[in-house]
């Protein structure tokens, strides 16, 4: 059975005649695994995979030479098909005992079975198990490695499992990138073993979900990991490969600041004019991470990997929670085709979430490439700052002079850029929260206090207002600290009634599916997606002029003076905010009445958002309601705020009808 499963001889043969691009079509569509199988292949079969007649003649001549040559009876040769066994292994330099050998082609060799000692079990997969191991080089130096062994049954390895195992070997042996897990060599024993680079800190998912007292990962570090991942995926895409299983569980921590892409069992080459791979039959795939075209048609491409990158980004900023938890696999596709999307995690900036939404574009051609994502991530990343004065105000992020601060995003009143409250993470305490911008100085500001919001990225769309984060995203979310790991936000039960833990977007109040936990949905994002295809009227004519939101007070928003009870909506994390209204602060009953009126008029907004909107409009309830609806429509679509205002005006401020209109015309 082993000679039948071996297929690397075919790759070697095709490479010699510059036809390597036909390796996978011949292997998977024509099912050729041995030279004699070509006796049953007709010219029209080769025509069907796009091979021209001159190329067919070259292949025929190469097969004649192969069959006329000496028949090797070596079992190793039959598996590797002409990849010459390299029995000598380079030695480690004596002056650098802590470094792994240099990545040279000769290192990816056949390794004697006795040179590898397996230790503790690290994990298992579909066709193999992974152990920690020790590889003893001929020089006597021992190198820590990971050893992946083929799962063997009572009658030996199954043909499918062996083929998958060897396919993974053939992929990994040609990869060399600082953020891709490296294959050192192959052990041809019983069982077959891959000797790979060891990532001693385990998977990123395990680190994200580690319980206390393990501190959470810093936001700046997560952004670094995203840039490393985008670079590695751009490398795979440039080599014509699609990963198909991109998730935090398959990202390994080689060091505290370095991740490596691993698990190449589902990797396939991209072929054809459309540059995609289509599954030939039912095989297990990670449903919650897959793009709609992968679930509907079994089609995978670099664009579907970009979709998975967006889900992986969501995982990283939600603390490793499972996407679409509680939703049956057969319903995930329906949710995605209804334009439902995972909500913005509390730690994720609006700029990064905007990138995730671009990765989740319904049409693959509308998603950015990985090479483009590298630049976008650099622009959307957080800014580094240093605390210049102690902050001890109630509700604010506590910080001391000299603390390193990562500015996740800055925000200000729409028309009052001088009244700035920023959201960030204290690098000393790992806590996240809001704080006055004047309390920090930016690392690139020459030691001057920061007085205006900072965003290193460029606005993705819409009109740009001075002093706003992400171009024109203007709302100030004071004290918007995320809940502790393992806890959910204290949301009123009546308002949570229609939100499922599976994160699907619903407009009606229905039963909640049960299942694995998920981060609390951001209602503003989830609620605006219609349940079914609406009957849309013609596009309304957009006038050249548009009303502008009411002008807010120019006063700085004061710090709250009274601390509400813990179970009061204002006592929730991220909900404390004193609204500066025209003529001074409203009395508490009057303020609460207006907040309740706004909250009942705009479905899905939070108590804090209503209070912020009233503060920005001087207490005008109608203007606050309209501004919130414009804000929701803006974040749902790719249109500018002025366009959103005019569309809502046309639909008489019916947000549901306006949402259906913009979703039908993205």
UniProtKB/Swiss-Prot annotation:
EC annotation?
2.7.10.2
Which molecular function term from Gene Ontology is one that the record holds? protein tyrosine kinase activity
GO cellular-component term (any):
cytoplasm
Residue positions binding ATP = 122-130, 148
- Superkingdom is Eukaryota
- Maturation and modification: Autophosphorylated on tyrosine residues.
The ranges of region (Disordered) come to 446-493, 506-579
Q: Which GO terms describe its biological process?
A: protein autophosphorylation; protein phosphorylation
Record field: compositional bias (Low complexity): 542-552
Q: Does the keyword Transferase apply?
A: yes
Gene3D superfamilies (alphabetical) = Phosphorylase Kinase, domain 1, Transferase(Phosphotransferase) domain 1
Swiss-Prot/TrEMBL keywords: ATP-binding, Cytoplasm, Kinase, Membrane, Nucleotide-binding, Phosphoprotein, SH3 domain, Transferase, Tyrosine-protein kinase
Residue span, SH3 domain: 380-445
Q: Which CDD domains match?
A: SAM_TNK-like, UBA_TNK1
Catalytic activities: L-tyrosyl-[protein] + ATP = O-phospho-L-tyrosyl-[protein] + ADP + H(+)
Localization per Swiss-Prot or TrEMBL: Cytoplasm; Membrane
Tissues expressed in: Expressed in all umbilical cord blood, bone marrow and adult blood cell sub-populations and in several leukemia cell lines. Highly expressed in fetal blood, brain, lung, liver and kidney. Detected at lower levels in adult prostate, testis, ovary, small intestine and colon. Not expressed in adult lung, liver, kidney or brain.
Q: Where is the composition biased (Pro residues)?
A: 531-541
What function does this protein fulfil?
Involved in negative regulation of cell growth. Has tumor suppressor properties. Plays a negative regulatory role in the Ras-MAPK pathway. May function in signaling pathways utilized broadly during fetal development and more selectively in adult tissues and in cells of the lymphohematopoietic system. Could specifically be involved in phospholipid signal transduction.
Q: Which family does it belong to?
A: Belongs to the protein kinase superfamily. Tyr protein kinase family.
Subunit composition and interactions: Interacts with the SH3 domain of PLCG1 via its Pro-rich domain.
Q: Write down what this protein is called.
A: Non-receptor tyrosine-protein kinase TNK1
- Gene behind this protein: TNK1
């Amino acid at each position: 059975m082993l000679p039948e499963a071996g297929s690397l001889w075919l790759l070697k043969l095709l490479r010699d005649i510059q036809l390597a691009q036909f390796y996978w079509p011949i292997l998977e569509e024509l099912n050729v695994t041995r030279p004699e199988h070509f006796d049953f292949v007709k010219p029209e079969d080769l025509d069907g995979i796009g091979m021209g007649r001159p190329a067919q003649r070259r292949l025929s001549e190469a097969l004649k030479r192969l069959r006329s040559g000496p028949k090797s009876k070596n079992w190793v040769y039959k598996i590797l098909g002409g990849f010459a066994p390299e029995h000598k292994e380079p030695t480690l330099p004596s002056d650098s005992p802590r470094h792994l050998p240099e990545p040279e082609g000769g290192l990816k060799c056949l390794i004697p079975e006795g040179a590898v000692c397996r230790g503790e079990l690290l994990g298992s997969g579909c066709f193999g198990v992974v152990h920690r191991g020790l590889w003893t080089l001929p020089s006597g130096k021992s190198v820590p490695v990971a050893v992946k062994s083929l799962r063997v049954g009572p009658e030996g390895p199954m043909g499918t499992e062996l083929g998958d195992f060897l396919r993974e070997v053939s992929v990994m042996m040609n990869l060399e990138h600082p953020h891709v897990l490296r294959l050192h060599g192959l052990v041809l024993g019983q069982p077959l073993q891959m000797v790979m680079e060891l990532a001693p800190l385990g998977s990123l998912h395990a680190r994200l979900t580690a319980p206390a007292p393990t501190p959470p990962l810093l936001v700046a570090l997560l952004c670094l990991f995203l840039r490393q991942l985008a670079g590695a995926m751009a490398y795979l895409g440039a080599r014509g490969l699609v990963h198909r299983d991109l998730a935090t569980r398959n990202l390994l921590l080689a060091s505290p600041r370095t991740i490596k892409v691993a698990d190449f069992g589902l990797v396939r080459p991209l072929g054809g004019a459309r540059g995609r791979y289509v599954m030939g039959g039912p095989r297990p795939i990670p449903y919650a991470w897959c793009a709609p075209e992968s679930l509907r048609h079994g089609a995978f491409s670099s664009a579907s990997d970009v979709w998975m990158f967006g889900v992986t980004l969501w995982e990283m900023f939600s603390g490793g929670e499972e996407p679409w938890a509680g939703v049956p696999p057969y319903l995930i596709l329906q949710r995605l085709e209804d334009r439902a999307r995972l909500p913005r995690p509390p730690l994720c900036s609006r700029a990064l979430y905007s990138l995730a939404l671009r990765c989740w574009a319904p049409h693959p051609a509308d998603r950015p490439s990985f090479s483009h994502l590298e630049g976008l991530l650099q622009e959307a990343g957080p800014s580094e700052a240093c605390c210049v004065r102690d902050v001890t105000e109630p509700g604010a992020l506590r910080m001391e002079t000299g603390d390193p601060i990562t500015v996740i995003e800055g925000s200000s009143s729409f028309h009052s850029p001088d009244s700035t409250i920023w959201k960030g993470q204290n690098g000393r305490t790992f806590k996240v929260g809001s704080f006055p911008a004047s309390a920090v100085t930016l690392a690139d500001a020459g030691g001057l206090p920061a007085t205006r919001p900072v965003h290193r990225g460029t606005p993705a769309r819409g009109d740009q207002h001075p002093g706003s984060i992400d171009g024109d995203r203007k709302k100030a979310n004071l004290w918007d600290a995320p809940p502790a790991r393992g806890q959910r936000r204290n949301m009123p039960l009546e308002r949570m009634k229609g939100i499922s833990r599976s994160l699907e977007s619903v407009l009606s109040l229905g039963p909640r599916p049960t299942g694995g936990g998920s981060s609390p949905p951001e209602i503003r994002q989830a609620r605006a997606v219609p349940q079914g295809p609406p009957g849309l009227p013609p596009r309304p004519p957009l006038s050249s002029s548009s009303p502008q939101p009411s002008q807010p007070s120019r006063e700085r928003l004061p710090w709250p003076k009274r601390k509400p009870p813990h179970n009061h909506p204002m006592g929730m994390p991220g909900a404390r905010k004193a609204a500066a209204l025209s003529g001074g602060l409203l009395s508490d009953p009057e303020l609460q009445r207006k907040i309740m009126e706004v909250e009942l008029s705009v479905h899905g907004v939070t108590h804090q958002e209503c209070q912020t909107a009233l503060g920005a409009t001087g207490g005008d309830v109608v203007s606050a309601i309209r501004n919130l609806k414009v804000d929701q429509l803006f974040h749902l679509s790719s249109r500018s705020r002025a366009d959103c205002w005019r569309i809502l005006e046309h639909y008489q401020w019916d947000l549901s009808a306006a949402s259906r209109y913009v979703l039908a015309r993205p």
